[in-house]
Amino acid sequence: MGVYSVLLAIVVVLVGYLLLKWRRALHYWQNLDIPCEEPHILMGSLTGVQTSRSFSAIWMDYYNKFRGTGPFAGFYWFQRPGILVLDISLAKLILIKEFNKFTDRGFYHNTEDDPLSGQLFLLDGQKWKSMRSKLSYTFTSGKMKYMFPTVVKVGHEFIEVFGQAMEKSPIVEVRDILARFTTDVIGTCAFGIECSSLKDPEAEFRVMGRRAIFEQRHGPIGIAFINSFQNLARRLHMKITLEEAEHFFLRIVRETVAFREKNNIRRNDFMDQLIDLKNSPLTKSESGESVNLTIEEMAAQAFVFFGAGFETSSTTMGFALYELAQHQDIQDRVRKECQEVIGKYNGEITYESMKDMVYLDQVISETLRLYTVLPVLNRECLEDYEVPGHPKYVIKKGMPVLIPCGAMHRDEKLYANPNTFNPDNFSPERVKERDSVEWLPFGDGPRNCIGMRFGQMQARSGLALLINRFKFSVCEQTTIPIVYSKKTFLISSETGIFLKVERV
């Protein structure tokens, strides 16, 4: 009995110690008198996420509540004290000027048990730096020009399928068909595979891409645990990727690589770049260790390129059409520009013609301001950092750093009438006057979005093809204002985007 009493006492003391430590962690900012909200015991400052609030709403509400109080507000990333940036000058320091102190994103990854988590977006340290350097060659202007005819080829099929949908019903849900377009583009450009999702909405590539983006392997409690105790989660062999998506993308990459190497096929695309990395050393660590890219690492890069590329571009195009349907004068101006430019290039959409569609670019940039697909940028502090001019505000080593770019894009101090769709915000004159960190849909600095050029190319070509042939208007099924999905980290419409479509 005495032994059991001692063991019980030890357990009680241990639990009490852990609860005390837990409580102290959740009062970190209050004890320093830094503005913050009272955190939830499990979710921290993410109370209601995926149930009653979208991620986007959380960043927006927090930013609007505390802006003007200091360079940042205290924020609890689940159980971890972190910061939410409130000042654009601090964002610039973190992303550009002091980048060496904030190079990592701090997201969970477990390459041993969850190989697709070893993607560029999640990698840290020297391995991220080496991988980024190698992959950058895939997204040069020359590579984009080479891929452009493929984009246009898929685009013509897209227009045909879109027209068929309109003939069946003048009310078209545009989000899904746009995602099928970008799925086929990326599948062809990255894998050299005909995905056929335009013809078949239930094609395997489309289904797996959709599931990888919108389905979670864990519920809110599991996500909170993984993000709060990353090292323990790795010891417990926890994964974040859906099992089916993992098997699918590993299989596709293995089969594609084997076929190309056996038949000596080169397509000068993303997969070729990965094959080159597989067959040449990649510096992996600070010690200078060099290794070849494995099939699993190749699959991870292909996975993020596919998943991020099809969803972000299709979402941007969908929201652009949503706004153009509400602003017929702007839509008419874009159409006039597209028709004039296409006429100038003998009725063809070419890589060079895209550069002449200046107002279309402004529409896309303004859409990305109002509907920032990734509404927050994540970083992790690598060493204690005192905010210049604010000795009270210190970011400790290991703290999560959140830059709520979606909320900043709707700040009236940065953009007049910030909730109004106005492509003139991105006229050449205004862009020259604006600091680059005041527009962050692709991030900024050395860790900006590596696929930015590809995403913009998809959006430009897809919208130019559509607007040249179709007129878009709102209808009874159009949700105004838009309601965001609560289930995904990226912004997307909860109910789809329904628009009335007519041929021009």
Swiss-Prot record:
Cofactor dependency: heme
Residues given in the record as heme binding sites: C449
A Gene Ontology cellular-component term: endoplasmic reticulum membrane
EC number: 1.14.-.-
Keyword annotations: Endoplasmic reticulum, Heme, Iron, Membrane, Metal-binding, Microsome, Monooxygenase, Oxidoreductase
Topological relation to the membrane, as annotated: Peripheral membrane protein
Localisation: Endoplasmic reticulum membrane; Microsome membrane
Keyword hit for Iron: yes
Enzyme class: oxidoreductase
A Gene Ontology molecular function term of the record: heme binding
Family: Belongs to the cytochrome P450 family.
Function: Involved in the metabolism of insect hormones and in the breakdown of synthetic insecticides.
Protein name (record): Cytochrome P450 6a9
Provenance organism: Drosophila melanogaster
Lineage: Eukaryota, Metazoa, Ecdysozoa, Arthropoda, Hexapoda
Gene from which this protein is expressed: Cyp6a9
